Amino acid sequence: MKNSIPIDLIYEILSRLPAKSVARCRCVSKRWRSILRHQVFTELFLTRSNARPRLLIGVQQDGEWSFLSTPQPQNRHESSSLVVAAADFHTKFSSGKSRHQCTYASGGSYSYLGFDPIDKEFKVLFMDTCDFIASKDEDHYILTLGTGELKWRKIQCPFTHEPFWERICINGVLYYSAYYSDSNGRSHLIACFDVRSEKFNFIATKHRYDQLINYKGKLCGINLEYARHVGGFPVKLSMWVLEDVEKPEWSKHVYSLWTESEVVKVNRNLSVSGMTATGDIVLSMEDATNPFYVFNFNPDRNTLQVQSVEIQGLGANRDHIACHAFVDYVEDFSVSDAVLQLKSSPLQQQGQDTSHDLSKSVKNKQLDNYEFLANKLNHSVSLAILFCLFFLLFNYLIRLCWVR
């Protein structure tokens, strides 16, 4: 009888690998590709990824984006930590393709992404402005993603306002900062757009916030104030939490952020990335300083953790390199597979024969590439499996000794 590893154990072992390693393993053979694209494996991998969310950092340089991810701090007793990160993947907008956008000569446009948790749909809200004012007399547009048809629909907004970029979507409602002008003058407000019903509302506020975040399921506005001396600390963090949407009723909280390290300095260049599932408010640098600092502040404990991230591959000259951080990043292969299927679906739906686009030489070259990858990866994959098996066996022995 042929000895083989149970498929459940294979799923268990490979789900512990990084996403990049899993993607490479898919190139080994058709059998491996079938295993690693199976629904059982993708769901198991997503479960493990949700248990270990990461911080995603996007680096923008010369029209090219690089994305890297680092672990989010787990040990709350550590006041500081150091991690080294290299780019997981790159993307570049080709210089041969130009983007044309028709807007008013003296205005601009704003677009926001929202999610409807009931129908599980993503929608894009697009607004053209004149002198940066979104008029109630002008059409706004909605694009529903994932339907297989990219078609904009017109909708109306009941009030004229001046939108800004601070935005967040919470429980199917898209919030963004704005100004509202009437006979009494100019006032601050939060525009509320229900993603499912596609209806607008607004909430009057006394401030414009540096950033909007999801604070335990509630809308929260945050402002930062820096110390005037060199170093920037302490940093005053003010929070306004929307406790009741109907009234509306806000609660204010003020904290003083400081670090004992004299090396860590900020120069009015912090951005609020969001709030993690564990309750930490994450602040990060807006530019690619060396080192790149990430701050994790827990309002309940009033503690601040400093994470120093060494970003590799940027070179010595880091001027004009922007950074954007996103919290609770998880890797999901089911989304990646859906994107690949969506990319290939238009030609298939039109019934076009794409076989003529590839010559026999290209096909042979692809086969050679697969064979090369298979030969190159077989060794590393085998080592990865052996390592995972050893790790599982070691944990089993430790537990066995502990029980005895």
From Swiss-Prot:
Q: Name one GO cellular component term.
A: membrane
How is it placed in the membrane, per its record? Single-pass membrane protein
> Mind telling me which InterPro entries this protein's record contains?
F-box-assoc_dom_typ3 (IPR013187), F-box-assoc_interact_dom (IPR017451), F-box-like_dom_sf (IPR036047), F-box_dom (IPR001810)
Q: Name one Pfam family in it.
A: FBA_3
| The F-box domain, residue ranges | 1-44
Q: What name does the UniProt record give this protein?
A: F-box only protein 12
Q: Which domain of life is it from?
A: Eukaryota
Keywords, sorted A to Z = Membrane, Transmembrane, Transmembrane helix
The principal location of this protein is membrane
* Cellular location(s): Membrane
- Transmembrane segment boundaries: 383-403
